[in-house]
């Protein structure tokens, strides 16, 4: 279920400790040309707003469950969000900084091509659910180079660098949103930190990629998107 409403209004309707996983991709602050990324007069105002929805996400998240926040380091704003907002949430523990790497798009002749986006993982408490066997990937080598070591038949656990070149598993929906994320990577997050029937929340659901991933993995999705055009697209996808 995706609602066409403001994220704080949506979160206010959720009870404490009722969500199993939060995965969200907030506005970056003056990175994308769209109006939704340029609605704050200053970085300070933007971070104050981030603190409000982050606090609400922590409130609704169950203990020992995870919060994932997508971002970009094209500017220092995402770093300040980590240091001045997430790190100041007393219940939350930093766990990982994941990189989504890709190889499409233009190049500059003046610097190395920047081809990645960032993903912060925090848990509510030191312990958290992590179902490693659900997200294993094939080994590159067929046999271990170490003597007496057998490779896991299910594959290896991914590193914190996730290469993935296409935005979605369906070309039909590629490009529906300027900051769209690959459904396959969202499925990985969901499988790692939830069980079937658990509740997954995305408060900036865009064109609905997280909702699609939740549906494909038999989870309950709850989310919102304030932009009516993107909300309508997400409804079509589902």
Residue ranges and their predicted role:
Residues 1-224, 228-233:
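Core catalytic lobe of class I
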